[in-house]
């Protein structure tokens, strides 16, 4: 893989800049946007970026940092899903707490925002409190967003309980957008000043990157990733007016800046040190880019990937037509097409060939996989196994120089598994999934040296690209994710079944 980003340089620059910002205050409330862990988008568009860079940065500053996690009560009620992991936001909070503790980081508490006694939220609060985790309930802020006098009063932020913190940097994070991070920071700022403490607010968001051009593919890829939020990148006019310098930000931050500035000035009783929304940020990711061409190409591929993802989400009913069209339009505006993703044409051509040969209207799943050396392999679904499993077996055979004719998994192992699924468990679909095939392969590896060699090649699939001609099940997608494979799908179901397609 060609590297376009210097991770070590970025970590050094970023930690230094945060410490410089905190020096101005007794306490800095740092709103962390995006993903704190497993930032797969950043990893894809910035080749060389560590997906856990943010948490490693915090680990570096661990003596000075504690963390507050926000979760919007409405997201608990409607079981909002974190798309890249397929888990609900409340479950993601539990995972996040475990991961933060694994990095020796102190989790202060969980804040439930816009709380109004929702039943499912109360169950989640009980779960946390009975495990010894502090929970604060923040109701919707009266007067927000326009009535600044009410917002900054005992009727507004004053109604929220004060969260006791002890360290100079308080990171406020969440599973996703719209979780109430900003409101929590400002509420704390209000309480700090009421207590006579000098506190500050800053924002750490990786995208859009303020110091790369507005129409750079890296920033366009961010728009593509947030089509459902209707985010649009813009030139920060406040920054240009103040410094005569061009900086990129996004519409929500620019639109909310005048009110946010007034709220901060009302809380502190003095003129804000921030002249623009860009001023509020501490992001230094742009300084880690070492090869702009590599980043541009990776970002273009991400735009195509996002168009596929949005098309599948539209088919599943998760997004509206406007979102679907916007993702497609962004791709077309960059003069890109689906076929610019190398694995798309081989998958589609093989699927068309199979359909012609079978002379049936049935859809056959074909998965194409591009290896590190540029080789493209395909696998098809059959009565025995899914297309994902077939292509993985073909890939490990390729890496291990094992002939196609050699079976890695003995029928003695496969047949009892299929019988178990069909007869004992009564499964409608008996074809083995990718995960089931990998488990069967690991069993064979205990007695078969060839299978053992093939098993050893699985880590080589990390970073590979794949495309499926049909929508994959959640389990198949998660198995590919665990293997480190980026997969896209055509927005077509394998059959007319409504339940068994999932």
Curated annotation (Swiss-Prot):
Source taxon at top rank: Bacteria
InterPro entries: DUF1846, DUF1846_C, DUF1846_N
Pfam families: DUF1846, DUF1846_C
Family note: Belongs to the UPF0371 family.
Descriptive protein name: UPF0371 protein CLI_0399
Native source species: Clostridium botulinum (strain Langeland / NCTC 10281 / Type F)
């Amino acid at each position: 893989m060609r590297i376009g980003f210097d991770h070590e340089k970025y970590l050094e620059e970023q930690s230094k800049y945060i410490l410089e910002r905190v020096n101005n205050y007794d306490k800095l409330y740092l709103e962390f946007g995006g993903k704190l862990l497993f930032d797969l988008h950043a990893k894809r568009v910035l080749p060389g970026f560590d997906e856990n860079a943010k948490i490693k940065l915090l680990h570096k500053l661990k003596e000075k940092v504690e963390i507050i996690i926000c979760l919007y009560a409405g997201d608990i009620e409607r079981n909002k899903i974190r798309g890249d992991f397929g888990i609900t936001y409340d479950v993601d909070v539990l995972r996040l707490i475990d991961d933060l503790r694994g990095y020796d980081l102190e989790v202060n508490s969980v804040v439930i925002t816009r709380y109004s006694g929702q039943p499912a939220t109360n169950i989640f609060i009980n779960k946390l409190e009975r495990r010894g985790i502090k929970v604060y309930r923040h109701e919707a802020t009266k007067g927000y967003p326009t009535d600044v006098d009410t917002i900054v009063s005992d009727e507004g932020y004053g109604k929220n309980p004060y969260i006791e913190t002890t360290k100079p940097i308080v990171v406020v994070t969440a599973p996703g957008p719209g979780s109430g991070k900003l409101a929590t920071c400002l509420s704390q700022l209000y309480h700090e000043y009421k207590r006579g403490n000098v506190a500050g607010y800053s924002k750490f968001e990786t995208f859009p990157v303020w110091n790369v051009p507005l129409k750079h593919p890296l920033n366009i890829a961010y728009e593509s990733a947030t089509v459902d939020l209707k985010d649009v990148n813009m030139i920060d006019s406040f920054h240009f007016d103040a410094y005569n310098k061009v900086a990129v930000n996004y519409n929500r931050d620019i639109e909310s800046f005048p009110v946010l500035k007034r709220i901060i000035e009302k809380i502190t009783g003095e003129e804000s040190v921030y002249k623009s929304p860009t001023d509020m940020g501490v992001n230094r990711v742009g300084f880690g880019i070492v090869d702009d061409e590599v980043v541009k190409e990776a970002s273009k591929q991400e735009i195509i990937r996002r168009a596929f993802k949005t098309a599948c989400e539209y088919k599943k009913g998760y997004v509206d037509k406007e979102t679907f069209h916007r993702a497609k339009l962004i791709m077309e505006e960059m003069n890109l097409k689906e076929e610019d993703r190398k694995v798309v044409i081989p998958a589609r051509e093989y699927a068309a060939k199979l359909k012609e040969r079978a002379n049936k209207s049935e859809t056959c799943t074909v998965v194409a996989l591009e290896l590190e050396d540029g080789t493209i392999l395909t696998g098809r679904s059959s009565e025995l196994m899914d297309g994902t499993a077939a292509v993985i077996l073909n890939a490990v055979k390729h890496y291990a120089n094992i002939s196609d004719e050699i079976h890695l998994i003995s029928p003695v192992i496969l047949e009892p598994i299929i019988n178990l699924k069909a007869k004992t468990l009564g499964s409608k679909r008996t074809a083995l999934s990718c995960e089931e095939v990998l488990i069967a392969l690991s069993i064979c590896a205990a007695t078969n040296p060839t299978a053992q060699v093939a098993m050893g090649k699985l880590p080589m699939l990390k970073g590979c690209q794949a495309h499926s001609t049909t929508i994959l099940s959640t389990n198949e997608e998660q198995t590919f994710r665990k293997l480190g494979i980026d997969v896209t799908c055509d927005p077509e179901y394998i059959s007319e079944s409504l339940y068994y397609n999932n």
